[in-house]
């Protein structure tokens, strides 16, 4: 058991999403095919006739408990004062992709891979008892919520079509849709529920649980990253599904040609733009791996004790020891299950102030229900304000973000010709006052 929880610590101690993907740079009018990720309607009647993405990626780590200091993040994150901790690691890679734009219609083809790992409401006293045996006094758990760990990884092949629905001298309305073929390569979750008022008791070097009526569920499908023997296993399909992105954009054209906004789109360009998109509709169906999937019902009456600190160092040992206990019964496991995509509603308002200066307000709202979050990927609700300066070959971006998970962060991004690099939290990380760390990079070209 200790080795499993040490692996969990390693997962959430790396300085690798609470916020919107590619925060800051996603507001650019020059991204081309990359702009389909936030709204598939963006590419029609835009500044790009064609665009090719060679490689873009982002890694992001966020938590609700502690500011990130690389020298002490593990100890700070899991200290007992935090009580309940939640966190997320997200990696997003946009592979070779291209778009062809036009004044009425536009098309794009994208390849993408994404990984989410979530830590949900983990009680730090229970964590310490199972992983490190460092508790010095008895403790009554106050954990009405489900707690656990979730990991999902999948690849996407997407086709985007967008068109102008209406256009006159002052107004443009655009719509777009992306259909995605999904291939899942890993899905795992461990969930513990029903531990409210359960008691952790310390007896010398031994740790016991009493007065507990709880359930423990683990479902696993696809690549086992704790025992990965062949990297090529990641390219195999362990689950399949279909997903969709839907988008709508309204642009209010500039009042006169004298105020013309270069490369803001068709006509004179826009004074402001309003975008609404519903992203990541759909999910992936997996078959459960019977060797690594189980459900146990734990019932330890008051006055009785169940030992926690010697369950074992791997899943096989843990399952064998649980089955031997008089307080544990085995439950049934579904042969298959569905993991939802991180469905979200995205809203943006982008205003052109003149002289190549813009400011964008964007918000992202999670639409994945908390009841289903045990096995699903999801984003935290977030809001951002991004002032930016944009020329044809250079752009500077200053994203200011707030999320339900990691609170306030400030970042910076640069676009220089075909290259862009940035972070939604770099400025906050430099002050050691950030619960989030992220970085992104991209290489693309177009006309």
Q: Across the structure, where does each feature detected by a protein language model lie?
A:
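Sec-dependent N-terminal signal peptides
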Residues: 4-13
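Sec/Tat signal peptide C-region and signal peptidase I cleavage site
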Residues: 14-18
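Subset of outer-membrane beta-barrel
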Residues: 19-447
């Amino acid at each position: 058991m200790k080795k499993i929880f040490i692996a969990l610590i390693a997962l959430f101690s790396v300085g690798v999403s609470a916020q919107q993907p590619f925060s800051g740079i996603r507001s650019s009018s020059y991204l081309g095919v990359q702009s389909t990720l936030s709204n598939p309607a963006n590419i029609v009647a835009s500044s790009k006739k064609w665009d090719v993405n060679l490689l873009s990626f982002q890694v992001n780590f966020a938590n609700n408990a502690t500011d990130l200091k690389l020298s002490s993040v593990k100890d700070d994150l899991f200290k007992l004062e935090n009580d309940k901790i939640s966190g997320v690691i997200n990696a997003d890679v946009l592979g070779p992709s291209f778009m062809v734009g036009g004044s009425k219609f536009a098309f794009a083809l994208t390849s993408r891979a994404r990984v989410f790992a979530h830590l949900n409401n983990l009680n730090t006293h229970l964590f310490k008892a199972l992983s490190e045996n460092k508790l010095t006094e008895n403790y009554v758990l106050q954990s009405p919520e489900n707690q656990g760990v979730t990991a999902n990884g999948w690849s996407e092949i997407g086709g985007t079509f967008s068109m102008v629905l209406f256009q006159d001298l002052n107004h443009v309305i655009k719509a777009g849709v992306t259909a995605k073929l999904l291939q899942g390569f890993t899905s795992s979750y461990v969930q513990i529920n029903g531990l409210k008022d359960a008691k952790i008791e310390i007896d010398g070097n031994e740790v016991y649980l009493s007065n507990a009526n709880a359930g423990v569920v683990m479902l696993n499908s696809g690549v086992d990253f704790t025992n990965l023997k062949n990297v090529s296993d990641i390219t195999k399909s362990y689950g399949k599904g279909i997903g969709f992105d839907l988008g709508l954009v309204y642009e209010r054209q500039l009042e006169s040609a004298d105020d013309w906004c270069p490369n803001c789109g068709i006509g004179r360009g826009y004074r402001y733009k309003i975008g609404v998109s519903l992203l990541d509709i759909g999910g992936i169906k997996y078959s459960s791996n019977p060797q690594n999937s189980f459900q146990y019902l734990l019932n330890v009456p008051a006055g009785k004790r169940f030992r926690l600190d010697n369950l074992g160092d791997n899943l096989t040992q843990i399952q064998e020891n649980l089955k031997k206990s008089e307080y544990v019964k085995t439950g049934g496991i579904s042969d298959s299950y569905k993991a939802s995509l991180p469905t979200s509603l995205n809203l943006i308002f982008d205003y052109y102030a003149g002289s190549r200066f813009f400011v964008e307000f964007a918000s992202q709202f999670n639409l994945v229900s908390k009841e289903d979050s045990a096995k699903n990927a999801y984003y935290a609700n977030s809001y951002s304000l991004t002032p930016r300066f944009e020329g044809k070959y250079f752009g500077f971006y200053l994203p200011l973000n707030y999320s339900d998970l990691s609170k306030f962060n400030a970042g910076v991004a640069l676009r220089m010709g075909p290259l862009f690099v940035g972070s939604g939290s770099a400025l906050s990380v430099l002050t050691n006052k950030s619960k989030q760390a992220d970085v992104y990079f991209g290489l693309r070209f177009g006309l």
